[in-house]
A protein has these predicted regions:
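C-terminal alpha-helical interaction appendages
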Residues: 2-100
Length: 100
């Protein structure tokens, strides 16, 4: 059974990025924050920009860096998840590599 929530009530005051609703992957809570924040997938945002706005990957990444990641809209600003890092367990700890 699915439960539908009113995002404005569940994450009151969270910044929603217009036109990027399809890139939402969750909601983030942390101690000391005044409320919940929307969690977006960087890769999904880049895909939306490429398809919707007919950008190349490089153009989409530059637009993301300056106009989305660089946007500060207050304490409940959106946060972004980048799944391009792969954790690798080593004998003496962890190593992190970028996906190719």
């Amino acid at each position: 059974m699915r439960v539908t929530v009113d995002i404005d009530e569940y994450a009151e005051g969270a910044i929603l990025l217009d036109g990027l609703e399809g890139a939402i992957v969750g909601i983030v809570e942390d101690f000391g924050s005044p409320g919940r924040k929307m969690l977006y997938s960087k890769q999904k945002i880049l895909n939306i920009l490429q398809k919707r706005d007919l950008m190349t990957y490089d153009e989409a990444e530059e637009f993301y860096d300056y106009n989305i990641l660089g946007l500060y809209a207050g304490e409940l600003n959106a946060v972004f998840l980048d799944l391009e890092i792969i954790p690798i367990k080593k004998e003496d700890g962890w190593e992190y590599q970028l996906k190719e």
